[in-house]
């Protein structure tokens, strides 16, 4: 996928949550820390050879992390998942710091799966300068099963599945438009043969007005690409949180102390 993205002209490629090992305690447990480190090094080398930056999910020293790699193969930062779900708990603990970082001269940030349900985890990095939010995930329903999976032996009909998928799409759109920034989502594809595996796909790119400009299918592992017009990413609505006349502006300014700006040290 890294080579394919580079050949397509992309400057950055985003891969899903726990993409290095597969998501879930059983999959993570099958891989040693040495093997994880070796796999990370191979991804870094692929980025260097292909001259492309990457964001990839990895189990990282007790965290569920997004590893950010520059186009020269160097490690930029590891953003740890902040809000965990039951399937995270056997192998990871929550992160305690948000980050912004630069890729190709653009300030970015990243959230991981369940983090999307907490708008402050997007807005705070945007207030710190992020204009492209990457969102990597292995999304599941509230019962921790993939949306296409059968429940009590019965699969949802197309109408019900479509309604539920719409909720997940809407959350990505909301995080983009409520901050007026780009959002790039990379989610595990669904498995049509074994629907209890994987997720429900629909990786997408959302513009700062909340419109989905590119979207993958439910069951297809696909590369989607788009040229981001960064002039559209004004962060207009996010910055209104800091206006002196806004009653909660002091809270937002205080919370900004939890954002680490990588490269500004």
What are these regions (language model features)?
Residues 231-265:
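A conserved C-terminal secondary-structure "cap"
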Residues 56-58, 64-68, 99, 203-205, ...:
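Short beta-strand scaffold segments in enzyme catalytic cores
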Residues 79, 101, 186, 216, ...:
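Hydrophobic residues at beta-strand termini and immediately following loops
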Residues 35-55, 116-223:
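CN hydrolase (nitrilase-like) catalytic-core segments centered on the catalytic cysteine
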Residues 45, 60-170, 235-243:
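Active-site catalytic loop in hydrolytic enzyme cores
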Residues 5-32, 137:
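Short, conserved active-site loops that position catalytic residues or coordinate cofactors/metal ions
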